[in-house]
């Protein structure tokens, strides 16, 4: 899948963080990046964006990142979710990883190379899942065709 076909949703209440990550990804990739300062607004737009990966801040005024990513999971369980946190609270982060099924978390300040690697690996998971879903659909189509051929053969010899 070309980078230009990939859509990332980025949610953080700090405009500087959004600008920094969006600018970095614009330089390093061709990903489409949609940014929101409000998780509530991001959820309102979620269905129309066709996202491949989500990055969310942990502490935000409207809704915390764990709740937001949990709601993303309810609607798009296959989409990797990454938590961006300014707190080295490993216990709560691990709880979030388990409870919400996070793909990964990144501590602020982040290293751009690490961020790029985590995003790339998360997207690879998405791409592999999409390929698997397509293969499953192909097998189902082939199975349906085979069933129809079997019915035709039975009618001919019946």
Indicate where each model-derived feature is located.
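Helix N-cap/capping motif at the beta->alpha junctions
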Residues: 35-44, 65
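Active-site beta3 strand of CheY-like receiver
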Residues: 9, 49-55
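Receiver (REC) domain active-site loop signature in two-component systems and cognate sites
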Residues: 60
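Active-site residues of response regulator receiver
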Residues: 12, 57, 85
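C-terminal output helix
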Residues: 91, 110-119, 123, 127, ...
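Two-component/phosphorelay signaling modules centered on CheY-like receiver
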Residues: 15-34
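Non-catalytic signal-transmission and effector/linker regions of two-component phosphorelay proteins
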Residues: 1-9, 22, 130, 134, ...
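Alpha4 helix (beta4-alpha4-beta5 surface) of REC/receiver domains from two-component response regulators
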Residues: 67, 88-105
């Amino acid at each position: 899948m070309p980078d230009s076909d990939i859509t990332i949703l980025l949610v953080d209440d700090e405009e500087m963080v959004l600008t920094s990550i969006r600018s970095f990804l614009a330089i390093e990739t061709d990903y489409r990046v949609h940014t929101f300062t409000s998780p509530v607004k991001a959820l309102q737009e979620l269905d129309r964006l066709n996202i491949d990966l989500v990055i969310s801040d942990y502490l935000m005024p409207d809704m915390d990142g764990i709740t937001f990513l949990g709601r993303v999971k309810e609607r798009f369980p296959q989409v990797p979710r990454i938590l961006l946190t300014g707190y080295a609270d490993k216990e709560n982060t691990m709880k979030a990883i388990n409870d919400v099924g996070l793909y990964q978390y990144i501590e602020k300040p982040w290293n751009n190379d690490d961020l790029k690697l985590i995003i790339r690996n998360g997207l690879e998971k998405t791409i592999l899942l999409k390929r698997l879903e397509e293969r499953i659909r192909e097998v189902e189509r082939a199975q349906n065709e085979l069933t129809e051929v079997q019915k035709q053969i039975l009618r001919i010899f019946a």
